[in-house]
Amino acid sequence: MAMNPPITPGEILLEEYLQPMGISQNAMARAVGVSPRAINEIVLGKRAITPAMSIRFGAFFSQSPEFWHGIQVECDFRALAKDRKRLTAKIRPATELAESGQQTAA
């Protein structure tokens, strides 16, 4: 059975905040001082919510910026989950190097 793709930060922004509050993407963009394209690309999942954007979103929605940053980080980790084995295949744990007494040049 195919799994649905994970919900993106942009979907949360649109479906949980903008639509219920009756706020357009353009109005939000003007209010937070970014281009409408930036907000639209976040909504479409084509752009990430950066730490700077998290600060703007937090101020706009009267929330902590960490909330928006956390949503983005969680999404980023979910996207990398399928590549985890490939990314870590050749990495030796630090404890293994320490136990073997190997040192690297500074």
Where are these regions (language model features)?
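Short alpha-helical DNA-recognition segment
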Residues: 23-41
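The alpha-helix within a helix-turn-helix
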Residues: 18, 29, 58
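A short, Lys/Arg-rich alpha-helix, primarily the initiator
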Residues: 1-23, 70
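Short, basic-rich loop-to-helix N-cap that marks the start of a DNA-contacting helix
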Residues: 46-59
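A generic structural signal for secondary-structure junctions
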Residues: 17-18, 62, 73, 82
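Residue-level detection of the helix-turn-helix DNA-binding "recognition helix"
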Residues: 33, 44, 73
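Short, charged recognition helix plus adjacent turn
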Residues: 67-106
